[in-house]
Design a protein with these regions (language model features):
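Long, low-complexity, charged/polar intrinsically disordered regions
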Residues: 149-154
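Conserved Lys-Pro-Asp/Glu-containing loop-to-beta segment of HAD-superfamily phosphomonoesterases
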Residues: 156-200
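Alpha-helical substrate-recognition element adjacent to the catalytic core
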Residues: 2-146
């Protein structure tokens, strides 16, 4: 008999790590304080009536280019190694998985974050997650970030809740996601989801 699945959905910034993930290494590498960088990104977004996350991703690329640097994937992953996780986070996954086993359920972990997937991949806990839904860059043939590949903003996070619900985890698969599906065919019922975050 298949065990019921309990999905734990996590925000990342200020939930698993202590502040915005870009603050630890990426922003200092550009010579800014976090306050300076976020003011620049937020001002750019407001002045251009942009989604705030697209504005910060644009600002990341623009500031790197202004300093003669390419924004490379490996650099962002390396930035994740400087991340400070809250006490107990690293041990949490093994503990809750074992508890789930005792209760006769399977625990799955997912990230729904407005931070950067690449930085999360360097955090040391990325392997704990079945899927990481977070902002992500597309990289050109030279390996430099040139376009947002995925934007996970504060309201479209609900799309990914539906993906987990239906078991349609591939972000490029909109057809299956939008197809009608009987409730008893959905992989993870909404009642089996727990969202962990400082806000949704």
């Amino acid at each position: 008999m298949t065990k019921p699945i309990i999905a734990l959905l996590y925000d990342f910034d200020k939930t698993l790590c202590t502040t915005d993930m870009e603050d630890y290494a990426f922003i200092p590498a550009l010579g800014y304080t976090p306050a300076e960088f976020w003011h620049k990104a937020n001002t750019f977004g407001r002045e251009n009536r942009m989604d705030g996350l697209l504005a910060y991703m644009y600002t990341m690329i623009a500031e790197c280019r202004a300093q003669g640097k390419d924004l490379k994937r490996d650099f962002l992953v390396a930035c994740g190694r400087s991340m400070e996780l809250f006490p107990g986070v690293r041990e949490w996954f093994q503990r809750i998985n074992a508890f789930g086993e005792q209760q006769g359920v399977t625990i799955e972990h997912y990230v729904l974050s407005s931070g950067l997937k690449e930085i999360i991949e360097g955090s040391g806990i990325a392997h704990e997650f079945k899927q990481i839904y977070a902002c992500e860059f597309y990289y050109d043939e030279a390996g430099a970030a040139c376009w947002p590949k995925l934007d996970v903003n504060f309201t479209n996070k609900t799309q990914f809740v539906y993906r987990i619900n239906k078991g349609v985890l591939d972000v490029a698969d909109d057809k299956t996601l939008n197809d009608s599906m009987p409730d008893d065919s959905k992989r993870v019922p909404f009642t089996n989801m727990i969202y962990v975050g400082d806000g949704l």
